[in-house]
From Swiss-Prot:
The record marks 128, 179 as: Important for catalysis. GO terms for cellular component: cytoplasm. Its EC number is 1.1.1.85. The lineage of its organism: Bacteria, Bacillati, Actinomycetota, Actinomycetes, Pseudonocardiales. It catalyses: (2R,3S)-3-isopropylmalate + NAD(+) = 4-methyl-2-oxopentanoate + CO2 + NADH. Catalyzes the oxidation of 3-carboxy-2-hydroxy-4-methylpentanoate (3-isopropylmalate) to 3-carboxy-4-methyl-2-oxopentanoate. The product decarboxylates to 4-methyl-2 oxopentanoate. HAMAP family: LeuB_type2 (MF_01035). This is 3-isopropylmalate dehydrogenase. It comes from Saccharopolyspora erythraea (strain ATCC 11635 / DSM 40517 / JCM 4748 / NBRC 13426 / NCIMB 8594 / NRRL 2338). NAD(+) binds at residues 272-284.
Length: 347
């Protein structure tokens, strides 16, 4: 496997180092190329994502990203010029966010039940497509628009991906989350596409919920959800809530996926660069390690992915959550666990 690694900013390099430590135990022959994209490169050269680097990234099987963001860089520069550009250039139309409450992890929900859901969020359309602008700026008559783009092609491919994932899971249940009673045009398109694709998956049960009702049920009855499919904006919001009820975004992994596999998909922990704790060796690398599991599953290394997931599950069930250990110590534990007898029995 040819892997491009973007350690990024803040705690990104620290958690990526531990994720690679675990990866080396399960796929030792991985060919790794590191890229110094992020705040430091921008300060030094003014570059965010040179065309030459983008071309090199395309030649890899997958990309592992640590975190991007630094208070010394004006807000939005790294996000738009690096993260969003990668997403659009590499056609990462599926944003995949699993949310599982592992044994041993405390949820802020009083009676959460068994939480094991996957949110399939559309990643290249909606209001993030950049269709909008300002008229009469800085006047009392200023107008700001942000147009949500929803194409039949874009909606169908993410809905098909969500149905395929639902069909492969034990519960075989899919929920469309939208706001069809108000966003009638986009809502109609999403609803019709889900209905059409559902005919090809008679084994998958289908439900619909308004996005506001979804936020309620994620807190009061999160175990009802299996696979959720939704648009870019709604997905951005509810995935953070899903992370919060399953132990926080410090345990949340994500994948930015080109389901056609024409471009390398990118995997990253959901947490940010956390510059306030960077360099202290206290960042939890678990989300980065779980991102490696998603990566391995995507490239066809499912057995290795199960070992990594089982190692994380064992560690979370047995660790002292009030003092989980230094960054390197957690990485060492997980690297040892992926080859242990305990994990072999669970994987």
């Amino acid at each position: 496997m040819r892997l491009a690694v973007i350690p990024g900013d803040g705690i990104g390099p620290e958690v990526v180092a531990e994720a690679l430590k675990v990866l080396g135990e399960v796929v030792p022959d991985t060919e790794i190329t590191r890229y110094d994209l992020g705040a430091a490169r921008w300060h030094a050269t003014g570059e965010l994502l040179p065309e030459s680097v983008l071309g090199e990234l395309r030649q890899h099987d997958a990309i592992l990203l640590g975190a991007v963001g630094d208070p010394s860089v004006p807000s939005g520069i790294l996000e738009r010029g690096l993260l969003l550009r990668l997403r659009f250039e590499l056609d990462h139309h599926v944003n995949l966010r699993p949310a599982r409450l592992y044994p041993g992890v405390k949820s802020p929900v009083s009676d959460p039940g068994e939480i094991d859901m996957v949110v399939v969020r559309e990643g290249t359309e909606g209001p993030y497509a950049g269709n909008g602008g300002l008229l009469r700026k800085d006047t009392t008559h200023e107008i700001a628009t942000e147009v949500s783009i929803n194409t039949a092609f874009g909606v169908e491919r993410v809905v098909r991906d969500a149905f395929a994932r639902a069909a492969s899971r034990p519960r075989k249940h899919l929920t469309l989350v939208h706001k069809t009673n108000v966003l009638t045009h986009a809502g109609s398109l999403w609803s019709r596409v889900v209905e059409e694709v559902s005919l090809q998956h008679p084994d998958v049960t289908v439900a619909y919920q308004h996005v506001d009702a979804t936020t309620i049920h994620m807190v009061t009855d999160p175990s009802r959800f299996d696979v959720i499919v939704t648009d870019n904006l709604f997905g951005d919001i509810i995935t953070d809530l899903a992370g919060a009820i399953t132990g926080g975004i410090g345990l949340a992994a994500s994948g930015n996926i080109d389901a056609t596999r024409r471009n390398p998909s990118m995997f990253e922990p959901v947490h940010g660069s956390a510059p306030d704790i960077a360099g202290q060796g206290t960042a939890d690398p678990t989300a980065a390690v779980l991102s490696v599991a998603l990566l391995l599953d995507h490239v066809g290394q499912s057995e290795a992915a199960r070992r990594v997931e089982a190692a994380v599950a064992f560690d979370l069930a047995t660790r002292d959550h009030s003092a989980p250990g230094a960054t390197f110590a957690i990485g060492d534990r997980l690297a040892a666990l992926v080859s242990s007898r305990e994990v072999a029995q669970q994987a």
